[in-house]
């Protein structure tokens, strides 16, 4: 099966990522996937308005594709709850930061198809950038369906799972870097005498325009940057200051720090999960 039409999609966790995915898929005109949502409280909220809510157990039995959108520290407990209710052919699609496909496969049993996805909060506006990696038992058909579903909320590409920690350093949190640039440059514009709203609006449009120019032209960002620069002009003067303050090195270090922290969080999540499982096993009543 390579088309999501008629597919049962159950989203476990209705936070910003989960609810945005559910709405995007449910409202897509391309296919008529059946979308259900579970929440921790079981109660509807503004984020789940217009969506069908079910219990975790009910959702597990009805899912062709189970989207796991929980916090890392809550994921092990959810899987323990739904593991026995999932059908053998249900594909588990994880949006959980730091947890690998191997971690899910070990928790859910041999042969379970698992797909791991990194995305961005821009999926709220249908502008997300998602990267999907298949586990040991995910087939090309599984990946095709997942990518089709993800295109309802932005773009989606496949990549080896080894790339995903690095992806999180430039894409997962990458939009925050652009927010920071707009924030600081707005302050700089105000310092130079511009009204704050005007400075911010101009910079937002500059960011949108730059993104569209890179996408539409296919040219290297350095080439596009050089198009803006004129000999002895304002932009060259600005970039001399950026180089003097080693902004390039700071960005390299920021991405490296995010990558390293992602690996630390993944290791800690796996350790916490093993400790929790060990404690539960020790506290289990004898049969």
PLM regions: where:
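Rossmann-like NAD(P)(H) cofactor-binding subdomain of soluble oxidoreductases
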Residues: 21-23, 36, 42-45, 49, ...
């Amino acid at each position: 099966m390579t088309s999501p039409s008629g597919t049962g999609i159950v989203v476990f966790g209705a936070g910003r990522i989960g609810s945005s995915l559910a709405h995007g898929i449910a409202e897509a005109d391309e296919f008529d996937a059946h979308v259900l949502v579970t929440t921790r409280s079981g109660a509807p909220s503004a984020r789940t308005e217009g969506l069908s809510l079910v219990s975790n157990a009910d959702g597990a039995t009805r899912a062709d594709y189970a989207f796991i959108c929980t916090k890392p520290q809550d994921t092990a407990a959810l899987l323990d709850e739904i593991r026995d209710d999932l059908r053998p052919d249900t594909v588990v699609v994880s949006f959980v930061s730091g947890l690998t496909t191997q971690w899910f496969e070990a928790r859910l049993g041999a042969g379970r198809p698992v797909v791991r996805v990194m995305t961005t909060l821009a999926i709220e506006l249908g502008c997300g950038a998602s990267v999907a990696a298949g586990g040991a038992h995910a087939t090309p058909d599984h990946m095709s369906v997942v990518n089709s579903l993800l295109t309802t909320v932005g773009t989606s590409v496949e990549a080896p799972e080894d790339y995903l920690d690095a992806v999180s350093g430039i894409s997962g949190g990458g939009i925050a870097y652009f927010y920071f640039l707009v924030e600081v440059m707005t302050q700089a514009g105000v310092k130079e005498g511009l009204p704050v709203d005007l400075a911010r609006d101009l910079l937002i449009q500059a960011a949108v325009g730059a993104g569209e120019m890179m996408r539409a032209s296919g040219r290297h960002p350095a080439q596009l940057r050089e198009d803006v620069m004129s000999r002895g002009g304002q932009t060259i003067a600005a970039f001399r200051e950026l180089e003097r303050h080693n902004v390039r090195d700071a960005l390299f270090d920021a991405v490296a720090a995010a990558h390293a922290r992602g690996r630390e969080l993944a290791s800690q999540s796996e350790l916490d999960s093993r400790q929790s499982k060990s404690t539960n096993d020790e506290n289990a009543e004898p049969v």
